[in-house]
Amino acid sequence: MLSADYIVGLTDGEGSFTAYIRPPQAKHGAKNYRVECHYYIKLRDDNVALLKKVKQFFGIGRLSFQRDRRPHHHSCFRYEVTNLEQIARVIIPFFQRYPLQGDKIRDFVLLNKIVRAVLKKKHQTRTGLTEIQRWKAEMHQYADSPNTGNPFVRPRQGKSRAR
């Protein structure tokens, strides 16, 4: 069994917290925007056994295969949790108890805000949706990204890391 610290480190390095905002689908009678929240860890296909252990650790989520045909890229597996209630009940409390140490803590904090807003149905109001869109826009803006308006971003000290 994996440790909580290992899960935190793996998420800091290979994981993501994100949200998607989908417009209403009139053909299905929907009037409101849909907000989808995601937590995932993506690893090369030769590490699928590790992702199975992550799935076992949390007891929720699913594994999926992603084929990549680009030169110099590997196909991968993805462990993902997209069920809002499971994210609220399992993923958020876990990372509150065992905090992330890297830049992704900002994405986690923003996802937590989005999840709470969606559970309260705030995405069904114009002001609530606008607030969620603002939080979504702040996600994935790290100190070495070309972003100037993100209040979470602090300039890095010393040498910047090579990518």
Predicted ranges, named:
Residues 1-163:
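Sequence-level preference for short, compositionally simple segments enriched
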